[in-house]
Amino acid sequence: MNGIGINKISTNPVTDKLRSGRPSVGTWLSLCSPVSAENMAGVGWDWLVVDAEHSPVGFDTMVNCFRAIQLGGAVPMARVPWNDTIWMQRTLDAGAMGLVVPMINTAQDAKKVVSNMKYATKGIRSWGSSRVAAYIDNDYRTWTEENLAIIVMIETAQAVENAEEILSVEGVVGCFIGPADLALSMEAKDIGPGTEHEAAMLEVLKVAKKVGKAAGKHCGSGEEVSMRIAQGFQFLALSSDAGLMGKAAREEFDAIDFTGGSDNSKGKAEGKIY
């Protein structure tokens, strides 16, 4: 253990699970809040992804989210805005133990992802101070060679067509399907069982299994996560901190009887304060 009582990290639990064929479930953080990150980390997720693509999160906030995630026992990850060397380098230096990289359409795109995340001679990531290095039970550079979770997003019709070549790129741990952008790319009017959209996602899963990589996607409910695990998907995101908070708030708000005529108080106010 280090000076503040956090166990040293020997491997990455996310890459360990994905490479062994097991499911790994987490959620997206889009509220740009270390407090939310800390709260979510205690739920039991394997990982939490700070969404830097579709939220206004800044680097100062991101690094504090990573700290909160780590203290809560989950693996800190991020979705970067683009396959950009500087963005990816800074996010890894800030403490991410894996990245989800959007809009990967070709094998060449995937090779660039790996290069951006690897040090020489396997990549172009520049050496600099990385705050997570203090928590690694090994040389950080050596640790990154096998343990960074390198997840590419397949979210266009072109990417589905090129999925085998993309996932065959050395260093890529798995893929994450963006169902909404995929539907837009396919001009899909319907989604769900029996649709072309569903068939495309299952084709990506089939290809991933063929080349020995993990496939994943964003899910709207725990029931869908269970269904996707049964299908063979591994890297699965359940909603987001904002989505889960909103859902819980709506459910409780809808349960309020504003007429004052309901006698539903028995047992409802009982429980522990602490």
Residue ranges, per PLM feature:
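Expand to "…catalyze enediolate/carbanion chemistry for C-C bond making/breaking, isomerization
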Residues: 1-274
